Design a protein with these regions (language model features):
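Catalytic nucleophile-loop/oxyanion-hole region of alpha/beta-hydrolase
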Residues: 66-91
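Conserved alpha/beta-hydrolase
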Residues: 43, 47-69
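N-terminal cap/lid segment of alpha/beta-hydrolase-fold proteins
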Residues: 1-23
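Short substrate-entry loop that stabilizes the transition state in hydrolases
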Residues: 35-41
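The alpha/beta-hydrolase serine catalytic core
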Residues: 107, 119-187
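Short beta-strand immediately N-terminal to the catalytic nucleophile in serine-hydrolase-like folds
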Residues: 99-101, 126
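Short beta-strand element of the alpha/beta-hydrolase
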Residues: 25-33
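Gly/Ala-rich beta-loop-alpha elbow adjacent to hydrolase catalytic centers
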Residues: 101-109
Length: 187
């Protein structure tokens, strides 16, 4: 089982993460999906793989996810991307790394190329969902759903047994973080 720790981002915000560091080793950085956490099979499978192959490992829970502080409704792609870059700078430092992004984590991963393009040596998207807020949600919302989101600032999207709080600020921020149909500069 993973040993979780917390990294203090600010006086009021802490991010839960797993980090396992092998001296002189490159990193595997795992980023989970929308409203997910580090309790699932994927992060633990990649941690196990990293340990077996003596690769350093980092995975984190964005604010409002899992046991990290904050409320989900206050988060967005920009905020979660920034939190990710803070932890990469803290733990990976100047070492090379491979990014693994699951669902929304792939979108957060692609945003990391803007900062770490010389350090990133590989990228794996699992069920990659960049720009899903616009393409898979907003464009598929009915007129009534859009009106409620605009009026209330939030829409409780029911999907199966789950309910997802989709805020207007989350949708708008997603539009500021477009990565599809754009060139990604990497080594």
């Amino acid at each position: 089982m993973a040993n979780f720790r917390f990294h203090q981002i600010s006086n009021t915000q802490k991010i839960r993460h797993i980090s396992k560091i092998f001296k002189n080793s490159s990193f595997i950085v795992f980023l989970h999906g929308f409203m997910s956490d580090l309790e699932g099979k994927k992060p633990n499978a990649f941690l196990k793989f990293a340990k077996k192959n003596k690769k350093s490992f980092l995975a984190l829970e964005y604010s409002g996810h899992g046991k990290s502080s904050g409320k989900f409704v206050n988060g967005n792609i920009s905020k979660w991307s920034k939190e990710t870059s803070i932890l990469i700078k803290k733990y990976v430092k100047k070492k090379e790394f491979i990014l693994i992004g699951s669902s929304m984590g792939a979108w957060i991963s692609l945003n990391q190329f803007k900062i770490f393009k010389k350090q990133i040596k590989g990228f794996l998207g699992i069920g990659a969902a960049p720009e899903f807020l616009e393409n898979l949600m907003w464009k598929k919302f009915t007129k009534k759903m859009k009106e409620e989101t605009i009026r209330k600032g939030i829409y409780q999207l029911k999907h199966g047994n789950y309910e997802y709080p989709i805020t207007l600020q989350l949708i708008k921020d997603g539009r500021k973080n477009k990565v599809l149909n754009k060139k990604i500069n990497s080594n």
